[in-house]
């Protein structure tokens, strides 16, 4: 669930 991430969900690994 990467809604706050501007890039792809793959970028949201943090």
Swiss-Prot record:
Provide the positions where the record notes the PTM 3-hydroxyvaline (Val).
6
Residues recorded with modification (Z)-2,3-didehydrobutyrine: 4, 13
Q: Which residues carry this modification: Decarboxylated threonine?
A: 14
Enumerate the residues marked as the site Not methylated: 8
The cross-link Pyridine-2,5-dicarboxylic acid (Ser-Ser) (with C-9): at which residues?
1-10
- Superkingdom per UniProt: Bacteria
Q: What is this protein called?
A: Thiocillin
Q: Which organism is it from?
A: Bacillus cereus
Q: What is the lineage of its organism?
A: Bacteria, Bacillati, Bacillota, Bacilli, Bacillales
């Amino acid at each position: 669930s990467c809604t706050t991430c501007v890039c792809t969900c793959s970028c949201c690994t943090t």
